């Protein structure tokens, strides 16, 4: 029995909790190490007994921690040892089972290592074979690397602190001098044995703890291979020894003694400069260790944490701080602000908070994994226990389980935790209880006096090694811990029992580990010694709470979950109440709003009603006043009849009809001619009824239909003008009148042309003929006026054709359908009566400008006069039949009409000029008899060039040459050409028209090679491009480039242009991409640019030209006009900068 200095027995029957103390394994300056055995499971352990008097005197060496000058540091070195050893969980690190205390001593229950110290093995055997020495050395390095990854430095590595278990595996022990490598500070404590100490330690300068442990491992490797130390003095002169260590002077063994790989590794480890010294992870990769591989050690290496775990512990938890671990750190730092700890965890560099967080997090994960494994083992054993023989005396009955107070089951596995259950003192002493995880050495003779270590270490107590390591599981939650061994329950004063350190004075707390006293001096001055005699207790409740929460995780986790669930329910209830309150408030607002709207609507209705009444009264007054004025006016001439307002209205309608009739007849009183395809005339045998004075409603609708058709033909509204819609609107004005008959597709010629005899012109005949003037007078029309075609007034929106002289000033849609050969001065015909056809043909006016250029539809008269010569609107206006094409579908004057309607056509013997699509939806024209026209008349040359001719190709080549030579001359025409595209799937033209010859500069001649070029050009296309059309043709312009020459280098110009174009992104440039390798820039001019240009993709290439450079602008797609504008802007900038070569 151990007796303390005050002669107060602290241990009853030589037991400490469930552990019965046995023989002493070693003695040290701070205490001794005793062998212990669990009374219930038979598990062996080494108990390190430390006197509390050491803490009061402050003689514990190595108690200084890095950063201990800060208020956040842990107060005692022994606390550091408890926390670190409890949290470390590695096969090559000695395990701490539990901690107990009395009023005089502190008991650390450690893992028991049967084979003792490595030092004893070296003394007995001497130098070890290289493969065996490397096996020990590798396990040492793995354990040290594990500690370093968690920011822990041992600082006292030597063979005396390296223990061996029953399988001769290394167990690193004695963390009494361990320190946290934190806050980036250097350790300043000179500790460790001088033979194994690093040069920076013996020199007394601040040192890096990681490097010093590596030096100690190098000395141990030297001793394992040679059986001696590299730094030693036979005479024991410490001063000479320290000088050798400072200089790193030692004698390297020869090749006969150790291998070259071993020499290389020792040389790299025993390097004086700690910065150049090899690291632990690099040692594991050294050829010497790779020379002797081990499967078990390889698994341990793979399970090592990251080297910088202590620097970035949050990376393992997804950068979110665990609330449980944070609360533990708050307790560990004695109620420190959690926000301050969070800032420490997130700031760069190493600190104590990060190290302990990493340790706590790994311990929590390992505990959860082991708990799951143990539960699975229990399930399997519960199933297998059914088949156990009744003769086996295993106390597993429920009655005996209810009587237990503290049964500890230590598993044989080093990682399986200890199980704590309740049991009574009598049952503990009488029952032979075993659990599934109990040790296999239950039959070991505990009374044996066999010593496991004959070497006494005077510097520090060396605990014996454990057989198996165990970790902690939770205690039953609804039971309170009582005295473990008690002789009687009535006499508590004489019991002298030992309480667990986790107990608080209320005896409602329980723990599976211990906490040392926070203020031992206060206990020494306490007068209530009876209380101290009666029981030992924990005095640092904060630290006790920390230990309980860490190592009884499941119990406190359940409490936390219940608390969180309660808080969640409270929050949900509050949220529901708040939601209900908001809903009621919203409903009240909605009701108030509806009430206000209802009142406002009622008020507005009343105001509107009053206003209507006022307006009605005003109108009545005005009406009465108007009647009075009318009566006053009639008084002057009583005999005169009163004016009939209805009659005036009828007169007005008649005048409107006359105007419409005049316009309609102006289109039909012209002589029979092929100039105007809009005029349809019947055969000579048809008789036309005269116009009645009063037109019916159907005739009025017919007239409106013809007017709308003429407007559409004028190309002013085009296909966008919906004629049927307009007719429907006109019919709505007269809903009672319904047209009884369908309008005729052919137009009826009025009797104003009765003086002439209508001629049926052949299909290919010229649009001129000698007129017969038998009467020389025209018939009167219904309104009594004479009608002539010269009296027609055509609106100015139509274009002016330059094929006619200034004298007649013919501004009519007819000119768009005319040809040079078919031109006839109709005014002269009407005035002179006859006109010689041959003379007329000989007097045709040549085309002053090419009809191959484009022209917009909606231009003013002046603009048309300026650009009509180059306009492409003089192209094919209508097609004349060809002998090779007979059954073509009707011509569709509108571009969109070509793709609509049926292709059926009626056969007729008479030739009718082309007409627009009729209003009844039939979009085809009558087919024409081509054979008769081919024999009677030659083909008429059209004003539109044929798309397949070689002359057309010449025009395109000439236009491209003009664009290159004079880019600013035809700027508008180029922009239009860029916008035009070819519709490949258009229907073929009805008739092939003769090419229109362009004469420029007094007779330029067509080139022969252009025809060859045309043939090659045709082969590259799938469909014909030049389909005859009333509209302009769309063609895709070829890619063209423009170049500028600069005086600077290509690279400098490339950088300048890249910055310039990127600076213009706010003005419409987008997607500027640079390719420095080939000096190319690409980009896009968006449609919303400041110049209102089309969206265009362009490419800029820069080529070196000696010391100068050439920049080439290329249009990828879009408008070449936009590219030209961009080139002009870039040219202006380069000219201002003075880098443009002129």
Swiss-Prot record:
The modification Phosphoserine is found at residues 406, 465, 471, 617, 689, 719, 805, 807, 883, 930. The gene is GIN4. GO terms for cellular component: cellular bud neck; cytoplasm; Gin4 complex; nucleus. The active site is at residue 156. Keywords: ATP-binding, Cytoplasm, Kinase, Nucleotide-binding, Phosphoprotein, Serine/threonine-protein kinase, Transferase. Its main location: cytoplasm. Residues 378-412, 425-469, 676-698, 903-1031 are annotated as: Disordered. Residues 454-465 have a biased composition (Polar residues). This is Serine/threonine-protein kinase GIN4. Serine/threonine-protein kinase which regulates the localization and the function of the septins during mitosis. Phosphorylates SHS1. ATP binds at residues 25-33, 48. GO terms for molecular function: ATP binding; protein kinase activity; protein serine kinase activity; protein serine/threonine kinase activity. Residues 441-452 have a biased composition (Basic residues). It comes from Saccharomyces cerevisiae (strain ATCC 204508 / S288c). The modification Phosphothreonine is found at residue 884. SMART domains: S_TKc. Residues 19-289 form the Protein kinase domain.
